[in-house]
């Protein structure tokens, strides 16, 4: 009876890793669409919101994993590895969001291939 209280009762870490990876893919696809449609102001705003939404969902998963990690005695793999993995995954989502925000902040436009090739280095 006492031993059962030590076993993890909630949270499947691997399922949460998969959910987080799905949010990263969503953010990456939205960022890709943002870059491809950057000249369209309405689409740019829409895709920026999609990137932000996916990143915020990833943050919620990260916080949930860390909360469960601190309340679970037995974990399927080393708790430091779980902590490092989910935080590195969250860094990826953060960097995608940072890239989208930087493009908006500096009003970076989509240069044509010819402009990129002909510009001085």
Regions found by a protein language model. Name each.
Residues 1-119:
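Cytosolic, long alpha-helical scaffolding segments
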